Amino acid sequence: MAELGALNSLLRSSSIEDHEEALRIADAATKSSRSGDDITAHHTKVVALLKLDRFDDALRAIAAAGNRLEDLCLLEKAYALYKTGQLSEAEAALDIAAKSRGARHVAAQIAYRAEKFDHAATIYRELLNAADEGLVGEENDLRINLLAADAQLEWAGDGHRVPSNEKQPGREEMEAFETAYNAACGCLARGDFAKAAMLLKRSRDLCEASEDLGDEEKKTELVPIIVQQAYVSTKLGKLEEAAALQNVVVLDE
């Protein structure tokens, strides 16, 4: 039963970063349990597989452990189904799951991927309005995702579904390159190129100055920003500037 003790010790730690180790211990614990029904070990195994992006394996682990684990892991199952592109099945799993904050997050992601942008935006808006119930840093992620859903609605010609206050970038949208970029995309869809240019510049400046991204990550994030800058410059008649921006993208490839 040493592996079960190791698992309990692992779970007591405030943060588990080594997901391979968590998987190894949990897997051993499920095999060493005399009943073969240690629900904590099975649950830990599923979570570790999700953290390692092994979504098909997570689904197999849930199915193999029986109904008791499946009832406990409805949210994890829905997320794995979503990540493997099984959107209808993911929605069905969420309908059964309790409407926890985590379930709402997954529901919004499923709606976005299924191109139900109005529904996704509604969920993100509700979560944002109750941001005090969430985790530290969650509010910024919600704002990023809400603006992305809003931009998709604008591109689809459904801008009337976006509240007017979300069409006017505020201080919060200027604090992260992702929010500035998504706000810029909304402006592009509405044909407000001058405001889009300002937001894209802010997004690029923030991305280039970010201390959280490595050089390669910055290059990846900057490509769509600069491509949109080139497009905006063209729409504003600044053709030389557009050509220079296009050259930047080509040189970085």
List each model region and its residues.
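N-terminal alpha-helical scaffolding segments that mark the starts
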Residues: 1-55
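"A position-specific structural signal for the A-helix of alpha-solenoid helical repeats
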Residues: 5-9, 44, 76, 83, ...
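Short coil/turn linking the two alpha-helices of tandem helical-hairpin repeats
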Residues: 14-15, 85, 115, 135, ...
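Alpha-helical repeat scaffolds
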Residues: 20-29, 55-66, 87-97, 119-128, ...
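Flexible helix-coil transition and linker loops at the boundaries of alpha-helical arrays
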Residues: 29-36, 68, 129-137, 165-172, ...
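Extended alpha-helical scaffold segments
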Residues: 177, 185-192, 207
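Core solenoid repeat modules with strong leucine/isoleucine-rich periodicity
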Residues: 194, 198-201, 208, 218-253
